Amino acid sequence: MAKQKFERTKPHVNIGTIGHVDHGKTTLTAAITMVLATVGKAQVKKYDEIDNAPEERERGITINTAHVEYETEKRHYAHVDCPGHADYVKNMITGAAQMDGAILVVSAADGPMPQTREHILLARQVGVPYIVVYLNKADMVDDPELLELVDMEVRELLSTYEFPGDEIPIITGSALKAMECACGKRECEWCKSIWELMDAVDEYIPTPQRAVDKPFLMPVEDVFSITGRGTVATGRIERGQVKVGDEVEIVGLQDKPRKTVVTGVEMFRKILDVGVAGDNVGCLLRGVDRKEIERGQVLAKPGSIKPHKSFSAEVYVLTKEEGGRHTPFFNGYRPQFYFRTTDVTGVVKLPEGVEMVMPGDNVRIDIDLITPIAIEEGLRFAIREGGRTVGAGVVTGIRE
């Protein structure tokens, strides 16, 4: 069978299943593909195919992730599901699977469990903006009052972590029964909940703003001068767009950003009208000396990002087997933090009551860099020692 062309007619959204081990995340993922396959909107993925997820490497970290795709009438979805709890932690912190929204799976028979709480906290920390809840295994609960109780508990837990617990849609059903039935009819006792869930995901999780519509930002990878024309900074545009005549700021490695004007945009030595997110371009900058700009800085829309030295982050520390440290680290640890294109040394401050951090842990820390870098919430980074990756993190807040 010939490969189908990827149709870009529908808006694209990235989602994933999160929640406690054995609450039914993978079963639900399989059930979604089976139900949607009945109307030609997905390819069936069996439980085992999803559960035996292949290993991937992101920033030197091994993560097991299953990717499935499907669509509804309204949108196209890329859905990630991870077999193990550690995989979720790594996935969410490295941003390997960027989620525009998540389906939190909670077993109605057990209610919220430790990892339910941990995944909600992680979602809050790493900036997963929306959550929809699937209350699974409802076939195992005879008492409707018990379902109501779990519903309330989940809403309270979500509110604790600053999600709008009262507004979040909670769909009740049984992923296993839907998977076993797989007739896909909306009126079916079991398949109905899958349709309700997809409707809730369609309605409640907004279509994300496309990278090209965000304010311009390009990490500077290389700098050279062209005799008679000036200084060119090259890099891959991370977001937004840039054209000749745009005012931009050079941000990072200096205390104050510096304004300049783009007098030329080139791609593969050809002149471009406009460079957009994803393009590798060279920007000719007016009045900037070759020595006044360097790798590690960014070009950005004025006022859209500032240089900072102090921030909070959620980090995952690699295990020895992953090529990380063999020993714990303590307060005052001084590794390098690799942001976008450059390493900067920083000092780690552990939270109160935490004596040390072991390989394999995930922890919230405060970091003070020795030079300012263009930083914002949600920015991913690697922690390195002598060029070797020993951890991964995401900025959760700026501290000045």
UniProtKB/Swiss-Prot annotation:
Free-text function comment from the UniProt entry: GTP hydrolase that promotes the GTP-dependent binding of aminoacyl-tRNA to the A-site of ribosomes during protein biosynthesis.
Subcellular locations according to the entry: Cytoplasm
UniProt source species: Pelotomaculum thermopropionicum (strain DSM 13744 / JCM 10971 / SI)
Reaction(s) catalysed by this chain's protein: GTP + H2O = GDP + phosphate + H(+)
Sequence segments annotated as region (G3): 81-84
Protein known as: Elongation factor Tu 1
Binding site for GTP: 19-26, 81-85, 136-139
Residues in tr-type G domain copies: 10-209
PANTHER family the UniProt entry points to: ELONGATION FACTOR TU, MITOCHONDRIAL, ELONGATION FACTOR TU-RELATED
